[in-house]
UniProtKB/Swiss-Prot annotation:
Organism in which the protein naturally occurs: Saccharomyces cerevisiae (strain ATCC 204508 / S288c)
UniProt miscellaneous comment: Present with 1690 molecules/cell in log phase SD medium. Early fractionation of eukaryotic MCM proteins yielded a variety of dimeric, trimeric and tetrameric complexes with unclear biological significance. Specifically a MCM467 subcomplex is shown to have in vitro helicase activity which is inhibited by the MCM2 subunit. The MCM2-7 hexamer is the proposed physiological active complex.
Full protein name: DNA replication licensing factor MCM2
C4-type zinc-finger residues: 341-367
A GO molecular-function annotation: zinc ion binding
Length: 868
């Protein structure tokens, strides 16, 4: 039985050997013995367990062939493979790229990575384009070699892919995703939010392409490339900020402007990369100077006040204005941070450091340990970081409200752009960040809000001409500017402006003249860049109580473009100048500006000036003349600008002014501070029956005019009373009284029409326009006359000894003359302006004298004051 079985197996083996392909070479095996012809019943082939029914499978032909073709690599000649052979150990020069490779820039490296990723994606897509039916059908088919048909089909597809140079290579060079999305298709948002839509790869590439075309192709009316010139200027100055006008982007590509307003953080990242690429077209090696270019957005159309910011503005672009009140030092902030694992020494990162949260490493990717980790100071990238406090400008705070403030973060080259006291305009991203102290204070989760500045500019003069009409009560339009010029051509414009100062206050023409001169101001000068001369006019109002001094100060506060009100008792030296306090977060000393610093390029109003102590008053000496405040406290040595006019009101000693005593004995002010006031107005509450009657009539009429709805009732009541009295009296007498009253009213109305006050809103804009646009020059003036006046004033001052006259008063005459020229919107100071200025200074000097010499001085200086 076993012999028959063995014979049958031998026949099967011979049949399988004959079935080999005829082209197959004859198989040679070690020992000259064919394993197929070996006896099956040999001990090597018998089941070791002795089971006759189970035998080992016959070895596969391929496996046997592989075993027979093996080469012993560990023989005695193995070391000869490593011996040097100079004839063969040479590389083919055609196959070796030994050219020097330049270091790629960050933008070029990202572009190549994106191209390689896209190529790999296309290869994967083409390799698996068969549908399921074809795969199932191919899996069931075998070729004559026994290989699945599907594999051969895929192999052919790879071969076709390599051979289709014209189609595939062109697709790799030109990104097909860029061709799929156009600028119009970007508006069809296919995501839950703008942020998700922008971060999609095809959308971000399309946005980058359109932004690049905008920077390279946008032209002005003359056909000149706007941003090409700015990029060249950026390269010449080695700057890292490129200013982009938002209105230009909105006109050229509106959908991108919408994305920028809604998702500024994502858009600015793309914009910065595009700006770097555009800059490298002009300066290929610019990345060696600055690794990044920051796009600064300007002229954003919507301006918010700090109190108008709400949760709907979070993560969007906002534009706010305010005054910088506090500024921290400059700190290095982590941007891209790398860590060293102290156990295995590997470097982890880089990780992008966001301003909202701190990066924490949980474990090392190399050794899987949980630390400790240390920041790699050499490979970590830092950037400048600074925080400033922005407060609402004094003129924009609603009545009865406290000014709001916000923290603003300045990064990169924006640090130290502004100083405390400067009014700035910030365009940035309104963000929220976690504040543990705020949560503990409120007892429930809330977030603090900050503004991450994108651009910051100091506000200089008017901004309405840039397209912001109607946003500010002090801005003007072109039509209003023509109205200003028309008003300035009036011969009596100076008297009309003086009459328009505090029209609800009767009389005090000298005070109104001084206030008008202070509001318009003179022209600051810088002599050869070495010595600066102030152009602001300081005024001191000294007089009896109840003479409307505080009312005039309040009027100036509402009229001036920028005014800060302070009182003598409530203001200290640091409150007026500057203070140094410790920052609660960084524990460093920071600088905060006082009232004079906040009133920079405006007016500082100080009531109850006599109530200040001498130490506090001496602190403003430097601010009144040099218009700067020097600080040297807590290791901070700096100088702050205080370019403002000071209008102060004070009461005399004892409550009332004594005309029999000189000025120095009526007020407890020292000569150094008195000499710093350009105009001194002494107000006396004298008893004059006629003047008191006119004052009472004016006050009553003011109250009556404030209730216009009662005019008709009052007229009807008067007619009724007149009718009843006509019955009792004769008609002739009544008619005579009515005619006399009518003539008196006509004379009063005619006088009011001759000098009608300018509307307050128009006057505010007129003053601001004159301060920012008009800079009159001293040309063809009678300087000898000024010299004579100064000499006469000095002589009389020494003889009377009541009011000191210094060289500052000589400069005051010129400043006041320039202010009168500004009232006329004139480019030159005329002799008429000079005569008015001399009269103001002389009257100020004479009124400060005691009554015994006042009349004599008026006669002495009549030659300078008559006719004005």
């Amino acid at each position: 039985m076993s012999d028959n079985r063995r014979r049958r197996r031998e026949e099967d083996d011979s049949d399988s050997e004959n079935e080999l392909p005829p082209s197959s070479p004859q198989q040679h095996f070690r020992g000259g013995m064919n394993p197929v012809s070996s006896p099956i019943g040999s001990p090597d082939m018998i089941n070791p367990e002795g089971d006759d029914n189970e035998v080992d499978d016959v070895p596969d032909i391929d496996e046997v062939e592989e075993q027979m073709n093996e080469v012993d690599l560990m023989d005695d000649n193995m070391y000869e493979d490593y011996a040097a052979d100079h004839n063969r150990d040479r590389y083919d020069p055609d196959q070796v790229d030994d050219r020097e490779q330049q270091e790629l820039s960050l933008s070029e490296r990202r572009r190549i990575d994106a191209q390689l990723n896209e190529r790999d994606r296309l290869l994967r897509n083409v390799a698996y384009i068969d549908d399921e039916d074809e795969e199932q059908e191919g899996a069931a088919q075998l070729d004559e070699m026994g290989l699945p048909v599907q594999r051969r089909r895929r192999r052919r597809q790879y071969e076709d892919l390599e051979n289709s140079d014209d189609d595939l290579l062109s697709d790799m060079d030109i990104d097909p995703l860029r061709e799929e999305l156009t600028l119009e298709s970007l508006s069809n948002v296919k995501a839950n939010s703008y942020s998700e839509w922008i971060t999609q790869p095809n959308v971000s590439r399309t946005i980058a392409r359109e932004l690049k075309s905008f920077l390279l192709e946008y032209t002005d009316e003359t056909g000149r490339s706007v941003y090409g010139a700015r990029i060249r200027t950026l390269g010449e100055m080695n700057s890292e900020s490129l200013e982009v006008n938002y209105r230009h982007l909105a006109e050229s590509k509106a959908i991108l402007a919408l994305f920028l307003a809604k998702c500024p953080e994502e858009m600015l990242k793309i914009f910065d990369l595009v700006a770097m690429e555009a800059t490298e077209l002009h300066y290929p090696d610019y990345a060696r100077i600055h690794s990044e270019i920051h796009v600064r957005i300007s002229d954003f159309p919507t301006i918010y006040s700090l109190r108008e910011l709400r949760e709907s503005n979070l993560s969007s672009l906002v534009r706010v204005t305010g005054v910088v009140t506090r500024r921290t030092g400059v700190f290095p902030q982590l941007k891209y941070v790398k860590f060293n694992c102290l156990k295995c020494g590997s470097i982890l990162g880089p990780f992008f450091q966001d301003s909202n949260e701190e990066i924490r490493i949980s474990f090392c990717t190399n050794c899987k340990s949980k630390g400790p980790f240390r920041v790699n100071g050499e490979k970590t990238v830092y950037r400048n970081y600074q925080r400033v406090t922005l407060q609402e400008a004094p003129g924009t705070v609603p009545p009865g409200r406290l000014p709001r403030h916000r923290e603003v973060i300045l990064l990169a080259d924006l640090v130290d752009v502004s100083k405390p006291g400067e009014e700035v305009e910030v365009t940035g991203i309104y963000k929220n960040n976690y504040d543990g102290n705020l949560n503990a204070k409120n007892g429930f989760p809330v977030f603090a809000t900050i503004i991450e500045a994108n651009s910051i500019k100091r506000r200089e003069g008017n901004t309405a001409n840039e397209g912001e009409e109607g946003l500010d009560v002090f801005s003007w339009t072109e039509e209003e500017e023509r109205e200003f010029r028309k008003i300035s051509r009036d011969r009596g414009i100076i008297d009309k402006i003086i009459s328009s100062m505090a029209p609800s206050i009767y009389g005090h023409r000298d005070i109104k003249t001084a206030v008008a001169c202070s509001l318009f101001g003179g022209v600051p000068k810088n002599v050869n860049g070495k010595h600066s001369i102030r152009g602001d006019i300081n005024v001191l109002l000294l007089g009896d109580p109840g003479t409307a001094k505080s009312q005039i100060l309040k009027y100036v506060e509402k009229t001036a473009h920028r005014a800060v009100f302070a009182t003598g008792q409530g203001a200290s030296a640091v409150g007026l100048t500057a203070s140094v306090r410790k920052d609660p977060i960084t524990k460093e000393w920071t600088l905060e500006g006082g009232a004079l610093v906040l009133a920079d390029k405006g007016v500082c109003l100080i009531d109850e000036f006599d109530k200040m102590n001498d130490q506090d008053r001496t602190s403003i000496h430097e601010a009144m003349e040099q218009q700067s405040i020097s600080i040297s406290k807590a290791g901070i040595v700096t100088t702050l600008q205080a370019r403002c006019s000071i209008i102060a009101a004070a009461n005399p000693n004892g409550g009332r002014y004594n005309s029999t005593l000189p000025l120095a004995q009526n007020v407890s002010l020292t000569e150094p501070i008195l000499s710093r006031f350009d105009i001194l107005c002494v107000v006396r509450d004298l008893v004059d029956e006629e003047a008191d009657e006119r004052l009472a009539t004016f006050v009553v009429d003011s109250h009556v005019r404030s209730h216009p709805e009662n005019d008709e009732d009052r007229e009807g009541e008067e007619l009724k009373n007149n009718g009843e009295s006509a019955i009792e009296q004769g008609e002739d007498e009544i008619n005579e009284q009515l005619n006399a009253r009518q003539r008196r009213l006509q004379r009063q109305r005619k006088k009011e029409e001759e000098i009608s006050p300018i509307p307050q809103e128009l006057l505010m804009k007129y003053i601001h326009y004159a301060r920012t646009k008009i800079y009159p020059k001293l040309h063809q003036m009678d300087m000898d006359k000024v010299s004579r006046v100064y000499a006469d004033l000095r002589r009389e001052s020494i003889s009377t000894g009541s009011f000191p006259i210094t060289v500052r008063h000589l400069e005051s005459i010129l400043r006041i003359a320039e202010s009168f020229a500004k009232m006329r919107l004139s480019e030159f100071v005329s002799s008429y302006d000079l005569d008015r200025a001399i009269k103001v200074v002389v009257d100020s000097f004479v009124d400060a004298q005691k009554v015994s010499v006042r009349r004599q001085l008026r006669r002495s200086f009549a030659i300078y004051t008559l006719g004005h």
